[in-house]
UniProtKB/Swiss-Prot annotation:
It catalyses: oxaloacetate + phosphate = phosphoenolpyruvate + hydrogencarbonate. GO terms for biological process: carbon fixation; oxaloacetate metabolic process; tricarboxylic acid cycle. It is an enzyme of class 4 (lyase). This is Phosphoenolpyruvate carboxylase. The gene is ppc. It comes from Bordetella pertussis (strain Tohama I / ATCC BAA-589 / NCTC 13251). Its cofactor is Mg(2+).
Length: 980
């Protein structure tokens, strides 16, 4: 343990080489690119320093905890990997693989942990560097950063958009990140907590420090890294839904509860015509347009572990965490607002609130704000006990009745704010009160809106059972609902019947009973915590109009919607949201929505209950798995344009819900650029998008990073919604008229190429399950939902998320590029109908699309990032895991050829090397490859051992082997910074 007290520089685990480490496919030769790398190297000195510091800390910890032999083994592997990445000598690559194969006993686990933790530490340093650069830019007086709220507001004002228009949009807007518990989050909460502490210590080291203070911080850093090393990286039991709920709530405590009110405050200041003066009253809270959503506890699609109890738990735990925050803030306000009426007057309304608070202490007789806050605290505490039953850490000192609604709490806080502002207390109100006021308008008593989601075939079976058990069927006719065609189902007018289908005296199947219980729990949750607690019912695999109508009938059974004949009130029921996922569903989506909105009973509900707003969700994951990268993106784009036309013709506001993941194959990439690249009219102030897996922790584990990502979402929504639409629409129409035939041609060819490999190649499923760690991922305990919908090795049954995760692990990233090369090449060679006649002219057209059309430019940019992370030499090692040589050569040969073709076509269109225009990302990747490579080689070797042991004994006799595999999965995901 003496090493912990030694200077940080004593022992060096030198995972610290930053720039430049060439990629396998060659170092950059473009002089402009080399100059960019040199500039990046100069500006990366603070980042380099932090990574060296953390690397030295890790080295000390490893040597102290594991001994010099293990440390030397790790360092030898590191040096070999770095040497190969620098010089590209194949002998070093072979030596690295040979040394990995020699690892025995516990050494594979130690090596996997060492490289994984260094990549985690690098991520912490990079996130900190992003914050540092933004601050340095502001201190230097540079213009507002692209994607910032300031840049968005200034840009809009320069285009003639005034504050009134911005405020009008915000009053009706909806920007909602939705946290989901999809199984790509491979980090434990325990390690994330340590990450936050390390990040905080790095921030503290940037201050001007004495030698003693610096030494103390360095000791604290080593202590945190030692904690990380001695904390189990893996979960040995599968996550439960309750675990996932708690994991998500940790981000509210660390980020959302404090940061979201700050984003509102920043925006309010930017919209203020005059510079903020200290004693000018702060503006009232903005209308709540930025809110949080969640699928955790309500997403039943394919997860048998989600039911009414998990929904109730999610709502309860959310409210509990929220009231803890409110009570803490009100208590802190009581300490801050010490103004005395002996020194300054207070408003009569404030005095009345103080008198009603019940505090009769003579020590506070002249302190009306404190007396009022004691009463508010007591009412909040009573509300918390009433709604959640929680035991409070700090009891109220006076008895009080609970608040009925968040508006009542907001009204009391407004009384305090008004009195302060009228009595020269505006600067005091800004300290804490304004943020709490905004928080109450945003979070209410519910914290986040929990969506319900279920597959359409489940709804269909439930309704069929209800009809069968009711006896009189549809319109009084006994029928087999499942046997009806679509026309007969739509013709059923069950919504108009007042009588219930379900009976409390009938024992229904487990599935039907569970679905009805979930809907009843949603109704109870809305009554308890407010309607915002549950707002949407998402229908996965929406293929027909009846898929949506069935959910309305089930809501009627659960008492969620007004009975027939009663007035439909605003907010009545849950909005039925179709989820279009596959390529055929995306193509049918606009037609289904037109029919939906044309139904009189639906149109009335949309108008009265939903404020003329209808949400549509688009699935990026399944459409990609179904049709490949290009076809998925093009189908999504066409569907959005068609939906805009459908909704515009019916004067209904369209809200798009984007089911994006963190990998490009699942719609990942820059959220800001993706929003700006949406077709004109698709945003219009309405945006929901999923935040999944590694994205949640990378974006929101740190308050400042989280604030920036929320700012990006709001800024992009404002710019996309309010920038003059006429020119944008005209330009988009011109692009579509000129380039849609080319896109459709390439999309069809890309889909044919992709499906030819994935679905039409005999034995492809066997190849995939052998050449990727998909089987090992299934045992990683990283989510409550199974990796496959059914047992067996069929690509069709595999969920899209582990599908993408597996391709990322073996460094192929196939979901983010496959088929593009063939599509572009075919268009250049043959062209589509109406295309330019010569190859040169077609190439000029594609280059114009790449430079001028945001949709195509963003597509290529995302693909470029994926290709930069791919590595065929590593992937070839995974291919060797396939026992059948013919299958291995056939499939990997096709992948290799398409990879080379896609790289060549991308270079042809962009006329530059990969990521030449993004030296920062390129530098980060070049640094990481030398530390990801050993993990990949180790994973391959361990999978061989694990599968061989399973064949011999039916199980692995040495539990260390599968655990080491899981450690490599964790590290590779951290190194690539996206996974599934």
């Amino acid at each position: 343990m003496a090493a912990y007290n030694a200077p940080v520089s004593n022992c060096q685990f030198r995972l610290t080489h930053i720039l430049p480490i060439p990629q396998r496919h060659g170092a950059p030769t473009d002089p402009f690119q080399m100059n960019a790398i040199r500039q990046q190297s100069d500006s990366a000195e603070p980042l380099r320093h932090d990574i060296r510091l953390l690397g030295r800390c890790l080295g000390e910890v490893i040597q102290a905890c594991e001994g010099k032999r293990v440390y030397d083994t790790i360092e030898t592997l590191r040096r070999t990997a770095v040497r190969f990445r620098r010089a590209g000598d194949p002998a070093d690559d072979k030596l690295l693989q040979a040394r990995v194969k020699q690892l025995r006993g516990n050494d594979p686990n130690s090596v996997a942990r060492a490289f994984s933790y260094f990549l985690h530490l690098s991520n912490i340093a990079e996130d900190r560097d992003q914050n540092r650069r933004q601050r340095e830019r502001a201190l230097a007086g540079a213009g507002p950063e692209r994607g910032s709220l300031r840049q968005a507001i200034e840009s809009l004002k320069a285009q003639g958009v005034n504050n009134a228009r911005i405020r009008r949009l915000l009053s009706e807007a909806c920007v909602m990140p939705v946290l989901t518990a999809h199984p790509t989050e491979v980090q434990r909460k325990s390690t994330l907590d340590v990450h936050r502490e390390i990040s905080s210590l790095l921030v503290q080291r940037e201050r001007e420090l004495t030698a003693d203070e610096l030494s103390e911080l360095d000791l604290a850093l080593i202590g945190q890294v030692a904690t990380l090393w001695q904390t189990r990286m893996l979960r040995y039991t599968r996550l439960t839904v309750a675990d996932e709920i708690e994991n998500a709530l940790s981000y509210y405590r660390s980020t959302f509860l404090n940061v979201i009110p700050r984003v509102y405050g920043d925006l309010a200041r930017l919209l203020n015509r005059e510079p903020v003066k200290p004693f000018t009253p702060p503006p009232p809270p903005l209308e709540p347009f930025l809110r949080m959503g969640s699928w955790i506890g309500g997403d039943r699609d394919g997860n048998p572990n989600v039911d009414a109890a998990t929904l109730e738990r999610a709502l309860l735990r959310q409210a509990t965490v929220l009231f803890e925050h409110y009570l803490q803030e009100v208590h802190a306000l009581g300490a801050e607002l010490s103004a005395s009426t002996l020194l300054i007057e207070a408003d009569p309304a404030l005095l009345a609130l103080a008198d009603a608070g019940g505090d009769d202490s003579p020590h506070r007789r002249d302190e009306p704000y404190r007396r009022a806050l004691i009463g508010i605290y007591a009412r909040l505490a009573a509300t918390a006990r009433h709604l959640t039953g929680q035991k409070l850490a700090r009891r109220a000192t006076v008895p009080a009745a609970p608040y009925d609604t968040p508006d009542a709490l907001a009204a009391d806080l407004a009384v305090i704010a008004a009195s302060l502002s009228a009595r020269h207390g505006a600067p005091i109100a800004r300290l804490r009160l304004s943020g709490l006021q905004q928080a109450v308008t945003v979070f209410g008593f519910h914290l986040a809106t929990v969506d319900l989601r279920q597959s359409s075939d489940v709804h269909e079976r439930v309704l069929a059972e209800l009809f069968a058990r009711a006896g009189d069927g549809i319109d009084g006719q006994a029928v087999d609902y499942l046997a009806l065609d679509e026309a007969a189902r739509v013709a059923g007018r069950e919504l108009a019947h007042a009588r219930p289908l379900a009976s409390p005296w009938i024992a229904y199947s487990e599935e039907t009973a569970s679905e009805l219980a979930v809907l009843r729990a949603a109704a109870a949750g809305r009554a308890r915590y407010g309607r915002q607690a549950v707002l949407q019912s998402i229908v996965s695999h929406t293929e027909t109009l009846s898929d949506l109508l069935e959910v309305l009938v089930l809501q009627k059974e659960a008492g969620l919607i007004a009975p027939p004949g009663e007035t439909i009130a605003p907010g009545d029921g849950l909005m039925v949201v179709p989820l279009f996922e596959t390529i055929p569903d995306l193509q049918r989506g606009p037609e289904i929505m037109a029919a939906w909105l044309d139904l009189p009973e639906v149109r009335q509900r949309v108008r009265l209950a939903q404020g003329d707003t209808q949400e549509v969700m688009l699935g990026y994951s399944d459409s990609n798995k179904d049709g490949g990268f290009l076809t998925s993106n093009w189908s999504l784009y066409q569907a959005e344009r068609a939906l805009v036309d459908v909704f515009s013709a019916r004067s209904v506001r369209l809200r798009m819900f984007h089911g994006r993941g963190d990998s490009v194959g699942r719609g990942g990439g820059s959220s800001y650029d993706a929003i700006l690249a949406q077709p004109p009219g698709t945003v219009a102030g309405q945006l929901r998008l999923t935040e999944q897996g590694e994205v949640i922790q990378s974006k929101y584990k740190d308050a400042e990073v989280g604030r920036w990502h929320l700012e990006l979402l709001v800024a992009a929504t404002l710019e996309s919604s309010l920038a003059p639409q006429a020119a944008a629409t005209s330009a988009e129409d011109a692009h579509m008229q000129q380039h849609a035939p080319a896109m459709s041609f390439m999309s069809e060819l890309a889909q044919r190429t992709y499906r030819g490999l994935v679905y039409d190649t005999p034995g492809f499923a066997d190849y995939f399950f052998a050449a990727t760690p998909i089987s090992e991922i299934a045992g990683l305990n990283i989510g409550s939902r199974p990796a496959s919908r059914k047992k067996g090795q069929h690509i069709e049954d595999l969920r899209a998320i582990p599908w993408g995760f597996s391709w990322a692990q073996c460094r192929l990233m196939l979901t983010g590029w496959y088929g593009m090369g063939s599509a572009i090449e075919a268009y250049l060679e043959t062209g589509a109908q109406g295309a330019p006649r010569s190859r040169r002219a077609r190439l000029a057209q594609l280059r114009e699309m790449a430079s001028d059309w945001p949709a195509f430019r963003t597509l290529l940019s995302n693909m470029e990032m994926v290709l930069a992370k791919s590595d065929l030499a590593i992937a070839a090692g995974y291919a060797q895991l396939v026992p059948r040589r013919g299958l291995r050569e056939r499939v990997f040969g096709a992948i290799t050829a398409e990879h080379g073709r896609t790289l060549a076509m991308l270079r042809l269109l962009t006329r530059r090397d990969l990521l030449a225009d993004n030296p920062g990302l390129m530098a980060s990747l070049r640094e990481r490859f030398a530390y990801i490579d050993p993990l990949n080689y180790l994973q391959i070797e361990l999978i061989k051992r694990h599968r061989a042991a399973q064949r011999r004994a039916g199980d692995d006799a040495d539990i260390r082997v599968p655990r080491a595999i899981h450690l490599t999965i964790n590290g590779i995901a951290a190194g690539l910074r996206n996974s599934g």
